Design a protein with these regions (language model features):
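Conserved glycine-rich Rossmann-like NAD(P)H-binding loop of the short-chain dehydrogenase/reductase
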Residues: 62-78
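The beta1-alpha1 cofactor-binding region of Rossmann-like NAD(H)/NADP(H)-dependent oxidoreductases
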Residues: 94-106, 139
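C-terminal helical subdomain
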Residues: 217, 234-273
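Conserved mid-core segment of classical short-chain dehydrogenase/reductases
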Residues: 127-143, 186
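Active-site helix of classical SDR
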Residues: 157, 193
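Non-catalytic terminal and boundary segments that flank Rossmann-like NAD(P)-dependent oxidoreductase
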Residues: 1-38, 281-326
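Conserved glycine-rich cofactor-binding loop
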Residues: 48-49
Length: 326
């Protein structure tokens, strides 16, 4: 990581809340340790590259035992070996998160091998950018997106949450998108699946609050990854590096905020609430200004992106792991 990027990551990690926790709250009786990740067992999905890999490295640097999850065993082994070589502790758990039996096996392996999971980062996912007008006969786009973005993390949480409840402590971080606030055109499949996970976790957080289990939804802005390459409109837009995005995830693990938003997303949410029809008109113009990609129109297929317009995000266990948030 170059020096400017390292400085930005450091700034993101040093929030006022973190400063108070480390300098004030840590001295109070019964307070969490100044380094709340030390000794924690943290499972990170989509950990073979991108945000997931960067998150795993940051967690290991803070003394956590990291359980690396993705489909590609070779990529996971590389990340595990590099973390171990840097003095950290990591274990590779290859898993196809789109396969329910594989997820159930992952839960059993994590519980048997490590005695439980203290914190979970639901980072793996899939993004599709395609107009609904081009999706009349593509129900499978919505099914595939829900499978990895919603059903997989819910199944994983249902397997790991009982142990957290029994111990009276646990935390789940969901890597989402500011699109859940913006409701950006052409991302119906992607944003709907992320919104489902956002809502599920908010409700679970209320039900499990009394048991010491909390949830954070990180509504991520655009992240500079390979996946945004086919979308020319993104080329000149500002974007986070995977390391900067991972710093937000680590902040969520350490400080346990309810949500981490970005200002444009919050402003768009207010706009949608205060002037919904005007918002529709504005986003309709945006929709026409940025047309579907050639891949989404079925004219070409991006390398390693699967069906037209379908790409992996969040360093998930797909053909090539990477992430984007509209």
């Amino acid at each position: 990581m170059d020096r400017p990027a390292a400085g930005a990551v450091s700034l993101l990690l040093t929030t006022p809340r973190a400063f108070v926790r480390r300098r004030v709250l840590a001295r109070l009786p019964g307070a969490r340790p100044a380094n709340p990740l030390q000794g924690r067992r943290i499972l990170v999905t989509g950990a073979s590259s991108g945000i997931g890999e960067a998150t795993a490295r940051l967690c290991a640097d803070r003394g956590a035992t990291v359980l690396l999850v993705a489909r590609r065993a070779d990529a996971l082994e590389r990340v595990r070996a590099e973390i171990e070589a840097s003095g950290g502790t990591a274990y590779a758990h290859p898993c196809d998160l789109t396969d329910p039996d594989s997820v159930d096996a992952l839960v059993r392996d994590a519980l048997d091998a490590h005695g439980g999971v203290d914190m979970l980062v639901n980072n793996a996912g899939r993004s599709i950018r395609r107009s609904i007008r081009l999706s009349w006969d593509r129900m499978h786009d919505f099914e595939r997106t829900m499978a990895i973005n919603y059903f997989a993390p819910v199944r994983l949480m249902l397997g790991l949450l009982p142990g957290m409840v029994e111990r009276g402590d646990g935390h789940v971080v969901n890597v989402l998108t500011w699109g859940v606030q913006v409701k950006a055109p052409k991302f119906a499949a992607y944003i709907a699946s992320k919104t489902a996970l956002d809502t599920w976790s908010r409700i679970a957080g209320r039900e499990l609050y009394a048991y010491g289990v909390t949830f954070s939804n990180v509504r991520m802005a655009l992240v500079r990854t390979d996946m945004i390459g086919p979308t020319e409109a993104y080329a000149k837009l500002p974007a986070l590096t995977p390391e900067q995005a991972a710093a937000k995830v680590v902040r969520a693990l350490e400080d346990r905020p309810l949500t981490i938003n970005v200002l444009p997303g919050s402003l768009a949410e207010i706009f949608n609430l205060v002037a919904p029809r005007l918002s529709d008109a504005v986003f309709s113009m945006v929709d026409r200004r940025f047309p579907d990609s050639a891949a989404a129109r079925g004219q070409a297929h991006a390398a390693e992106s699967g069906p037209a317009g379908l790409s992996a995000e969040g360093s998930t266990n797909q053909a090539r792991e990477r992430r984007v948030a509209p």
